[in-house]
Amino acid sequence: DQALLDVVVIGGDTMEDILRGYRDLTGYPSMPPLWSFGVWMSRMTYFSANEVDEICDRMRAEHYPCDVIHLDTGWFRTDWLCEWKFNEERFPDPKGFIGRLKKNGYRVSLWQLPYVAENAEQIDEARANDYIAPLTKQQATDGSNFSALDYAGTIDFTYPKATEWYKG
């Protein structure tokens, strides 16, 4: 017989003592990369690779510090529908685009959602392989403005194959 639940109580005189005990048990976090503490540039969205290139070139020309350029939903094929694919009309060469930014000293952050929409290209594959946990309409609308997108489910990151699929 195996126990269904292990209960661990960590005591200490101060909160730091308790946290140290917790970290001793679970492990200490690694330090994020230095660039992640730097300056991030973003706005509601950029709508093309040309627009991003112009802004990034100007920041370098005018000696503004910037480590990360963040692209909001404008990189999507359909605004607000996260399918993890670039709109190739506005971003015709995604690899080249990101390569240019990296060469110019930028890291690139892309806005994403861990949901799959009913009309997303990936929905059939996600359902067939149990990569998503079903999402009720109530769950999709509670405190969110994404209900109009008709999300079918959230990616089940507790399932290793779903995590690998998402990374791919």
What are these regions (language model features)?
Residues 28-168:
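Aromatic-lined carbohydrate-binding/catalytic grooves of carbohydrate-active enzymes
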Residues 1-33, 43-44, 56-61:
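Catalytic and substrate-binding clefts that recognize carbohydrates or anionic sugar/phosphate headgroups
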